[in-house]
Amino acid sequence: MATASSSDDAGAAMSISIANSSKRPIATTKTAASIPPYATLAFGALSGFASCVLLQPFDLLKTRLQQLDHRPLSPVSNKSISKPQYASRTQKLVAITKDIVHTHGYQGLWRGTAPTVIRNVPGVALYFYSVSHLRSVASQRQIPLISVAIPSDASSNTSTLAKLSTTGNLLTGAVARVTVGFILSPVTVVKARFESSNFSAATERTLLSSMREIRAQSGFRGFFQGFTATALRDAPYAGLYLALYEACKTNLAGLSRSMDGGLGTGNWMVVSASGLLAGTLATLLTHPFDIIKTRMQTTPADTLHQIALAHDPKSTLSPSVLRDSLKPSVWGMTKHLWASSGPRALLDGLGLRCARKAASSAIGWSIFERGRSWYTEREASSSAQEAGTGTRLLDHKQV
């Protein structure tokens, strides 16, 4: 992507795979040998699984933080309700953690891991595959404002992702993330209910029982509850993240030129640091929509109905007609949050989400890019060995 770095750095990121090694016969061409889809999906799934298992407690605690109101007021009136008060978010976080450990033991911090894995492993795999494919297509077709010229040579220590402009990174990241998010929305809703304390563990024992409960309460639409807020969070997040990730890689690689030999954009330290920085910055900019998404997915149906009556224009309709289907809009939920908890409600769980996203980005992209680099290096070595064997056989026949 376009940055203030040198032209040598701009030529560091090659199209979807590394196939320009000087050991290979096709090194003089500009067409990179593509990594097969199964390899991209496998490395994406592996990175997603590692992030899920290691970082699930962050997700659980974030959900519990975001589902609480700051003041003991009902959603639509000034009547007090019995909710604990905390002087700070730190006290709230400590109290929630102690309650979970006391009630369920330390394993309780990993509640919701199953739906998280079911969502994230295929989700991350599909996202990495989709964004890689979109970037490869855009790079090869040289689309104006999206693609950039691909150099005929590149270091073996460069990224395996195709090179696009800032606009291209924004668009491909957003399209891939929102598409995958829509496909996996039902599992996302189940995951939120597993992590929330607003739903009975008896009805949320398994994925199937939770899905039956959602279907009974809200119908098929219940599986996409909060998707608008999710899309408003994910589209800018993914676009900003991918653009920032590529910018950080290029700039960090440029800064490393003062070192002996420098570091390429595919170096694991550059990739990990870029993922961490990009994940943190993109999270800061999109966090309010994560709050709204969580509230939409973890608030009981009757409370959502009351919020909709109080803050949405549909409240003028007969409550008896809308009792089973009325849900607040994104704007209606935003007004409720502002009225019941003030602007600070839009910051709940920000620290946990930043820590989780930063760590997830560093882990995910490191495993993904390292896996792809390992695959291309293995293929290059195999091709070199085959070429050497063929040459020896030809020499033997000539003798």
Curated annotation (Swiss-Prot):
Keyword Protease part of the UniProt annotation: no
GO cellular component, one term: mitochondrion
Compartmental location: Mitochondrion inner membrane
Membrane topology classification: Multi-pass membrane protein
A Gene Ontology molecular function term of the record: glycine transmembrane transporter activity
Protein function: Mitochondrial glycine transporter that imports glycine into the mitochondrial matrix. Plays an important role in providing glycine for the first enzymatic step in heme biosynthesis, the condensation of glycine with succinyl-CoA to produce 5-aminolevulinate (ALA) in the mitochondrial matrix.
Name used for this protein in its record: Mitochondrial glycine transporter
InterPro entries cross-referenced by the UniProt entry: Hem25/SLC25A38, Mit_carrier, Mitochondrial_sb/sol_carrier, Mt_carrier_dom_sf
Solcar repeat ranges per the UniProt record: 35-137, 164-251, 266-374
Annotated family: Belongs to the mitochondrial carrier (TC 2.A.29) family. SLC25A38 subfamily.
GO biological process, one term: glycine import into mitochondrion
Transmembrane segments: 41-66, 112-138, 170-195, 226-249, 270-296, 349-367
Region (Disordered): 379-399
A matching Pfam family: Mito_carr
Entry keywords, A to Z: Membrane, Mitochondrion, Mitochondrion inner membrane, Repeat, Transmembrane, Transmembrane helix, Transport
Catalytic activity entry: glycine(in) = glycine(out)
PANTHER family: MITOCHONDRIAL GLYCINE TRANSPORTER (PTHR46181:SF3)
